[in-house]
Swiss-Prot record:
Gene: lysS
Major localization listed first in the record, in broad terms: cytoplasm
Cofactors: Mg(2+)
Sequence positions that bind Mg(2+) 2: 414
Keywords tagged on the record: Aminoacyl-tRNA synthetase, ATP-binding, Cytoplasm, Ligase, Magnesium, Metal-binding, Nucleotide-binding, Protein biosynthesis
UniProt organism field: Lactococcus lactis subsp. cremoris (strain MG1363)
PROSITE patterns per the UniProt record, alphabetical: AA_TRNA_LIGASE_II
Name the UniProt record assigns to this protein: Lysine--tRNA ligase
Length: 494
């Protein structure tokens, strides 16, 4: 309770100062202010100059930012202004700025925004500074900065009030700047390879393109139930049918499922589709995206992540799912076997057989998830997923039990999912119907039948390679972050 009273006392004092500014004819919530430099530009241009060189140059600058430190007494004061790029020191003398400007400085609290015009100089201690000539009040902060702005330690507050985290935690601020750069570079990479960025609906009559539980809503005007998209896949492939040939979309998708260190119900994906390509071409594309981000954003191929060194340079390992299971668990699924034989194997290995499992393929996937996933530390393409768990992927020509699909695993987690797209409308309808049956048997992640998409395929879709990358996990990898909430500006909270 004492903390609340103290906070209220501070807020009252700040409001009094706001009124004092108004009484003095100063607007506490200013207007447009034009800067000549940000803090980084000043440091890059003048950090190497000596005090004497700067004095001789007699340069002036105009800066603006949030007041983060303030000290001094009498007729001289020092402060630091913080902008997006960093901080710059202010040197304020009453005899230089005049009575009115010095009053502005005295009345300013930490957290307030000031604009400052003055001489670019260095102090006797060698710190680059602006020797103020004129101060402009830009915005009064009516609440104090948290915990003396040394960084929020309460993680829930950091997530709920991200703006405070960004003010007080430079590491967090830089992480989100890196996120923006990563997304920009992915766009640059895709655009440079002739892909068109497109936008597809977030609200759909049927949620498809992935195995996940959707969020539902109701469209009042049309009086129909709709689902938020769980993937962008089916609309993007309609564009391939329409002749766009190479498309991608960066956007939010929504899955009404559990939350943990690597899952948030609202997250960002990049999906791409390329006509006349197959899943092996898309492996090369995926490698290229990761390596382009490594080169342009972080400047290195070897990443420190979760106590491990992850090398994203060179060719990623490629292994068939069945071979991976055989290597790790010693169980061989290459020979043909009945569902009953596979079920017996599952029970021997303490693998639960769900009611909606109807084929050996489901059992193979369970073995992979139990035994193999967590062992895949370095970037690894696992391909050859069973047909039953890959309703949108093309069957492998040599062994139709499996599909031309891959997932990219790093540090035991999936980072990308891709395949040679199924373009046979009759086969696609049969797989949709099998999914619908699984849904009836209790598989709440199974999809229904999207007849409109099947109709689109009936008009002809060329052989196509498709890719989906989880952007949030990718950002986690490249920023060394183990919680997805630390790479989402506003994560979902209860």
């Amino acid at each position: 309770m004492a903390e609340i009273e103290e906070l209220n006392d501070q807020m009252k004092v700040r409001r009094e100062k706001m009124e004092n500014l108004r009484d003095a004819g100063i607007d506490p919530f200013g207007h447009k202010f034009t800067r000549t430099h940000n803090s980084q530009e000043l440091h890059e241009a003048y950090d190497e100059k000596t005090k004497e060189e700067l004095h001789e140059l007699a340069l002036s600058g105009i800066v603006a930012g949030r007041l983060m430190t303030k000290r001094g007494k009498g007729k001289v004061g020092f402060a630091h202004l913080q902008d997006r790029e960093g901080q710059i020191q202010l040197y304020v003398r009453k005899d230089e700025v005049g009575e009115e400007n010095y009053e502005i400085f005295k009345k300013a609290d930490l957290g307030d925004f000031l604009g400052v015009e003055g001489e670019i100089m260095k102090t006797d201690m060698g710190e680059l500074s602006i020797k103020a000539k004129k101060l402009t009040f830009l915005s009064k902060a009516l609440r104090p900065l948290p915990e003396k702005f040394h960084g929020l330690t309460d993680t829930e507050t950091r997530y709920r009030k991200r703006y405070l985290d960004l003010i007080s935690n430079k590491e967090s601020f830089n992480r989100f700047v890196t996120r923006s750069k990563i997304i920009s570079e992915i766009r640059r990479y895709m655009d440079g390879r002739g892909y068109l960025e497109v936008e597809t609906p977030v609200l759909n009559n049927e949620a498809g393109g992935a195995s996940a539980r959707p969020f539902y809503t109701h469209h009042n005007s049309l009086d129909i139930d709709m689902a938020l998209r769980i993937a962008t896949e089916l609309h993007l492939k309609r564009l391939i049918v329409g002749g766009m040939e190479k498309v991608y979309e960066l956007g939010r998708v929504f899955r009404n499922e559990g939350m943990d260190m690597t899952h948030n119900p609202e997250f960002t994906t990049m999906e791409s589709y390329e006509a006349y390509a197959d899943f092996e071409d898309i492996m090369d594309l995926t490698e290229g995206i990761f390596q382009h981000v490594a080169k342009t954003v972080v400047g290195q191929d070897v990443l420190e992540y979760d106590g491990k060194e992850i090398n994203v340079g060179g060719k990623f390992k490629r292994v068939h799912m069945v071979d991976a299971i055989k290597e790790v668990a010693g169980v061989d699924f290459w020979p043909e076997m009945t569902f009953e034989e596979a079920t017996a194997l599952a029970k021997e290995h303490d693998i639960h057989v769900e009611k909606h499992f109807t084929s050996v393929g489901h059992i193979i996937n369970e073995f992979f998830e139990k035994y193999v996933e967590e062992t895949l530390i370095q970037p690894t393409f696992v391909f050859g997923h069973p047909k039953e768990i890959s309703p949108l992927a093309k069957m492998n020509e040599k062994d139709p039990r499996f599909t031309d699909r891959f997932e990219l695993f790093i540090n035991g987690k999936e980072y990308a999912n891709a395949f040679s797209e199924l373009n046979d409308p009759i086969d696609q309808l049969e797989r949709f119907e099998a999914q619908a049956k699984a849904k009836e048997l209790g598989d709440d992640e199974a999809t229904g039948v999207d007849y409109d998409y099947v109709e689109a395929l009936e008009h002809g879709m060329p052989p196509t390679g498709g890719l989906g990358i989880g952007i949030d996990r990718l950002v986690m990898l490249f920023t060394g972050t183990t919680s997805i909430r630390d790479v989402l500006l506003f994560p979902t909270m209860k």
